[in-house]
């Protein structure tokens, strides 16, 4: 977790000059962005690699810079993307979720409007839910990635946007998604306009609800009945907006053996 206040001011001054000179502006022009420190950002610490400074930007970071975003710093993670700090911005006695917690906190606390997280097993979604922002686990290959220092890490994880609302999340995804010739696993698909249908509503959508995702009751930790009830009420409340909500009770094979096998290939 590193703050580059001086560098951010320099980038902001350059962004101001670009406006004054009538230069072409990118979709993130002048917007502060924080990057989870498992991502490589030139000149910043990479917590995953245990390096105080790396000498290159990964592809998503390149695209943020090109779009005019101002990278003000990196957010805290921890070994194997699990940590003791930071704490929940709403209550310091509560946990803010797992590894992308630093990015979630930076967004929710108003430090930045946009951040990048990482998700392999809920690492973006849980901090977003627990801290109160939007977090997206992107499909494999949607956001290209190449890192020759830890090539196996992204076999289970993908980079994704975190923001205060769906529109901002879509805006950041618009910038970082799309194929790149350096990543042979990148999806070779055109990037749609992710903001185009945000105001369309959910009438007619089919939405599935499960209280354990098909395996947690049988194989994992017990659920909180209160949390399950609140989320279930929220899910079925979507029917009032025209969605078709269906409860499913499928039971899947336990995922942990496969996850543990993949994890053995993670660096460190």
List each model region and its residues.
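Gly/Ser-rich catalytic/binding loops embedded in alpha/beta enzyme cores
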Residues: 1-121
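Amidase signature
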Residues: 1-23, 175-268
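Alpha-helical scaffold segments in soluble metabolic enzymes
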Residues: 14, 63-66, 138, 168-175, ...
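Short, small-residue-rich loop/turn micro-motifs
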Residues: 35-39, 75, 140, 147, ...
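Short low-complexity, flexible loop/linker segments enriched in glycine and/or proline
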Residues: 85-90, 129-132, 255-267
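Fold-level recognition of mixed alpha/beta catalytic cores in primary-metabolism enzymes, strongest
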Residues: 86, 105-210, 223-226
């Amino acid at each position: 977790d590193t703050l580059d206040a001086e560098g951010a001011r320099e980038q902001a001054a350059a962004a101001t000059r670009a406006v004054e000179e009538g230069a072409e502006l990118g979709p993130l022009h002048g917007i502060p962005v924080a990057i989870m420190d498992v991502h490589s950002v030139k000149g910043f610490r990479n917590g995953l690699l245990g390096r105080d400074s790396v000498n290159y930007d990964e592809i998503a970071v390149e695209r943020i810079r090109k779009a005019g975003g101002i990278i003000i710093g990196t957010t805290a993670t921890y070994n194997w993307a699990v940590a003791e700090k930071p704490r929940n911005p709403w209550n310091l006695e509560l946990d803010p979720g797992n590894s992308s917690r630093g990015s979630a906190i930076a967004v929710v606390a108003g430090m930045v409007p946009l951040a990048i997280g990482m998700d392999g097993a809920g690492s973006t979604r849980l901090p977003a839910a627990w801290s109160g922002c939007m977090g997206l686990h992107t499909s494999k290959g949607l956001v290209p990635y190449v890192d020759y220092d830890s090539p196996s890490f992204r076999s289970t994880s993908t980079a994704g946007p975190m923001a205060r609302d769906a529109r901002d999340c879509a805006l950041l995804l618009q910038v970082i998604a799309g194929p790149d010739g350096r990543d042979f696993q990148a999806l070779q698909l055109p990037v749609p306009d992710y903001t185009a249908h945000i105001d369309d509503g959910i009438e007619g959508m089919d939405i599935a609800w499960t209280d354990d995702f098909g395996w947690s009751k049988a194989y994992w930790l017990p659920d909180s009945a209160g949390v399950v009830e609140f989320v279930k009420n929220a899910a079925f409340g979507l029917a009032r907006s025209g969605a078709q909500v269906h409860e499913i009770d499928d039971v899947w094979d336990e995922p942990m053996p496969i996850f543990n096998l993949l994890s053995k290939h993670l660096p460190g």
